[in-house]
Amino acid sequence: TFTHYSNASYNQTILQKDAHISMGVENTYDLALNGSPYLIGAITTYGDSTNNSLNIKAGSSVEFFTFLPKKDKNGNNTFDERITHLVGGLAYQGNVKNNKIFIKDANMIIHGPSKAYASLAAAHISAGYIDSESDKNFQASKNLLDIDSFNLDMYMNHDKQPLAYNSVLFADFLGGKTEQGQALDNTINIKRY
């Protein structure tokens, strides 16, 4: 769901068993990502996002792609801001409240480059998220990230499955996040990891 100059409330995105989401480009070692891959319960610009949810059910899978490291103004490596985002409710210039992400026995798959035995990816996982470019404060409150186990795996483009491989997911796990304002009474509930 997307709204502009209005509120987004009580929307759901549900990944059922065997659903597979693949967002990104094949060769991010040589080619920068083009746009930001988002999987969201609801997004609004200039409004509030409340009571929305992203539900990633058992047996479903989300594929994360590798990313190019970028340099900040001090010359340090930093994540490409166009990494994969999983968000329950997102607002640009608005408040987020009572949004949720549920992850239960889902598959998080790192997409390895051709012939690779190791790969890494970055992600931003937040039940409620506010992006703001003004002096006004916005509030992220009572959002819930609920994790009941997920399986980390790697997709490999090989003729034969190797005996061993490495997959690493660098992620920010957040109940609620605001670029400017207050984050109050947000929860991360981890049952199994």
What positions do the PLM features span?
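Surface-exposed loop/turn motifs in large extracellular/passenger domains
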Residues: 1-85, 89-193
